[in-house]
Amino acid sequence: FALKENPRAGIHIWLPKVQLQIQMDVIVEVKTGDITIPYWRDVPTNSRVAYGTIPSPGTVIESPLAYNHKPDQKRFAVLVCDIQSIKLLLLGVKHIRAHYKKSTNWQGEWLSP
C-alpha cells in the first residue's frame, strides 16, 4: 500500500446545492486482517467481488475476460483518517473561505478566497 509508505492524503467534498467545497488533510491508518471482519460483513455481497479480482487490477491479461472475481476478505482494508486540517470555501456573490487546524485546537481563521 502506498498509504503505508506515505500516510498523508486529502479528502475533497463538493456540495453543489449549497456551493460548498470542503478539503481535509488527513493522516491515514490502514487496517487489515481480523479487525476488518465486522466491516466486511457490511459490504453488500455483490460488491465484495471488487476485493478479489484475479489477477490483481492493472495486471496485463491475454484477453478482455481473462480474469476471475472471487471475493477475498484478506484483500479488504479499512482506512482510518485522522483529520489534520479542514478548509472550507463557500461560493456566492462574495466567496467565504476558512481554515481550521488540529494543531491550533480547531481555532479557525479566515482566508482570502
Regions found by a protein language model. Give the residues of each.
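Charged, gly/pro-rich active-site loop segments
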Residues: 20-113
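A short mixed-secondary-structure module that forms the rim of ligand-binding clefts
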Residues: 1-19, 27
